[in-house]
């Protein structure tokens, strides 16, 4: 882990250190808010210049135009400036020209551009176009009967798109029955694989992606179980206790002595502290398990995740969401919003401070340096989210 991160140069939380960032109620100080806002404006200008040379055919949320639209929708929600809505509109149109009819997910497939477009048209009071996008989104379910189940390319990533629409419309635009039907498919698929590979006694559910049993949030078990425990998926109490909980407990047993988690079952190298692989993604599963099952052990493991991230989370890979410092900082915000413990808000602010020095640490330049999940757009999204910490949610993943 240590060789993939910069040593954390910051002192950990104490009350007097935190006073420069937020008050006793957790509201950011005007000075720190201004620093964040100034950096957001500066990075947006850099990003817009950089996007002129981005791949014109990539419409995805992860590395393409839909992701930039997600950022501008978020900035519109945070700052209320209609100019951001217009910018989002331009990127939505570009993303809709890039649909591939191959993948169904929010981040890497057609569901992202369609869901984002539906929400954007709704905000612009263009309900006819919004409805058209929703219809197309619902029909995507038929594209790939052999889709995997994970977040980036699988059924969970499709479910996120459906929930994203319902949340932003404030009404059930996507019928609950449609969401539950996909959820049932995910559960059945997990039971079948667990039986086939002799996992059932240890873990009643099992999922693979490219012949590997991934553990993390992006491709693996933690991301899938985080969703299966969401109230909006309406998994029955019986199945939550008989299928999901023992499967979550199996993931908990994979924890390294450090408090981190392996990228795959059977991989004993304790290296990756990313949202996609490791503690920064697993923490969401643990917190959701604590909310649903009210067992202290899940919270203890989540605290351990946060300590690993504080120590090893300032990544040499960069400042992005998927495998970067901004994505890792969201773990602190999630824990803060659960516990109201100011230590975690402070840690998020310190990781934001690191991001305020974007490009000055000698990090690796990502393949898509301005994108939502690998690059600058994701960092901007995080800095804007931190302005109102209680509303912060890891984009395209956290509910």
Swiss-Prot record:
Supply the source organism's classification.
Answer: Eukaryota, Metazoa, Chordata, Craniata, Vertebrata
Q: Which key words tag this protein in UniProt?
A: Acetylation, Cell membrane, Cytoplasm, Membrane, Metal-binding, Transferase, Zinc
- Mutagenesis or variant effect for residue 364 to A/E: Loss of glutathione binding
**Result, substituting residue 317 to A:** Loss of glutathione binding
Q: Give the multimer and partner information.
A: Interacts with the C-terminal of STOM. Interacts with the EPS8 SH3 domain. Interaction with EPS8 is inhibited by glutathione binding.
Q: Which organism is it from?
A: Homo sapiens (Human)
Q: What is its EC number?
A: 2.5.1.18
Instruction: Tell me where in or outside the cell this protein is found.
Output: Cytoplasm; Cell membrane
Enumerate the CDD domains for this protein: euk_LANCL
What family classification does the UniProt entry report for this protein?
Belongs to the LanC-like protein family.
Q: Which GO terms describe its cellular component?
A: cytoplasm; plasma membrane
Q: In which tissues is it expressed?
A: Detected in erythrocytes, brain, kidney, testis, ovary, heart, lung, placenta and spleen (at protein level). Ubiquitous. Strongly expressed in brain, spinal cord, pituitary gland, kidney, heart, skeletal muscle, pancreas, ovary and testis.
Specify which residues bind Zn(2+) according to the UniProt entry for this protein: 276, 322-323
Q: What other remark does the UniProt record contain for this protein?
A: Was originally thought to be a G-protein coupled receptor.
- Which InterPro entries does the protein's record reference? 6hp_glycosidase-like_sf, LANC-like, LanC-like_prot_euk
Bilayer topology annotation: Peripheral membrane protein
Q: What is this protein called?
A: Glutathione S-transferase LANCL1
């Amino acid at each position: 882990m240590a060789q993939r991160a910069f040593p954390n140069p910051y002192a950990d939380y104490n009350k007097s250190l935190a006073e420069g960032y937020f008050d006793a109620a957790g509201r950011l100080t005007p000075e720190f808010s201004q620093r964040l806002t100034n950096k957001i404006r500066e990075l947006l200008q850099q990003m817009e210049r950089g996007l002129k040379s981005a791949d014109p055919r990539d419409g995805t949320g992860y590395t393409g135009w839909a992701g930039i639209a997600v950022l501008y929708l978020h900035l519109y929600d945070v700052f209320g400036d209609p100019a951001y809505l217009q910018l989002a509109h331009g990127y939505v149109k570009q993303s809709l020209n890039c649909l591939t009819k191959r993948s169904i997910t929010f981040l890497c497939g057609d569901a992202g551009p369609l869901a984002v477009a539906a929400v954007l048209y709704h905000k612009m009071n263009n309900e006819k176009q919004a409805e058209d996008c929703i219809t197309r989104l619902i029909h995507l379910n038929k594209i790939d009967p052999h889709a995997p189940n994970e977040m980036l390319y699988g059924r969970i990533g499709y479910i996120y798109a459906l929930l994203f629409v319902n949340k932003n419309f404030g009404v059930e635009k996507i019928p609950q029955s449609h969401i539950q039907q996909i959820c049932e498919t995910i559960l059945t698929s997990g039971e079948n694989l667990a039986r086939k590979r002799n996992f059932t006694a240890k873990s009643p559910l099992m999922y693979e992606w490219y012949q590997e049993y991934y553990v993390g949030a992006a491709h693996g078990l933690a991301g899938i179980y985080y969703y299966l425990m969401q109230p909006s998926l309406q998994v029955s109490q019986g199945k939550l206790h008989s299928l999901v909980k023992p499967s979550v407990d199996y993931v908990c047993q994979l924890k390294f002595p450090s408090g981190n988690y392996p990228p795959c079952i059977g991989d004993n190298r304790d290296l990756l502290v990313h949202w996609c692989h490791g503690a920064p993604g697993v923490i969401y599963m643990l917190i959701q398990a604590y909310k649903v099952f009210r067992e202290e052990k899940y919270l203890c493991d989540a605290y351990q995740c946060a300590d690993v991230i504080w120590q090893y989370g300032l990544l040499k890979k960069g400042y992005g969401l998927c495998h970067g410092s901004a994505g890792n900082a969201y773990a602190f915000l999630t824990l803060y919003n659960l516990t109201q413990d100011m230590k975690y808000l402070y840690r998020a602010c310190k990781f934001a401070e690191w991001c305020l020095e974007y490009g000055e640490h000698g990090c690796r330049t990502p393949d898509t340096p301005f994108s939502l999940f690998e690059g600058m757009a994701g960092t901007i999204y995080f800095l804007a989210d931190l302005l109102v910490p209680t509303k912060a949610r890891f984009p395209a993943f956290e509910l």
